Amino acid sequence: MRKLKLKINDKDYTLEMTRDSIKWLEAVGFSIEEFDKKPVTFYDLVWTSLFITNHKDVNPSLAIKLMDTYKKSGKNPAKVVRFAIEEYQAFMNALADTDSKENDEELEIIEA
């Protein structure tokens, strides 16, 4: 998975969407299919999830403050959220990839 590097308030942040951040998103109720119904809530959750792997000291409240600071500095948080959603979808596609040529492993299925 790709990583994104941001500088906010003169501090470097390495943001990424990982299995742990996706599990966190699921635990707090995120659903990509429901994004249209709760766009602001899910937008904030997706932004926040990017900090989970490398910045455990960043709680959801601080993550939102960092997003506001990022926006006030003239940058576009929507691009970061778009990156996160692309990474989320790539992870889900890889998880469900049953047609891959690399995945031609034969499984031995036995009756229980």
PLM feature spans:
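Short, hydrophobic/amphipathic alpha-helical patches that form generic packing surfaces
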Residues: F42-T53, R82, E86
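Charged interaction scaffolds used for protein-protein
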Residues: M1-D12, I22-K23, A27-K37, K56-A112
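Short linear motifs in exposed loops
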Residues: E16-M17
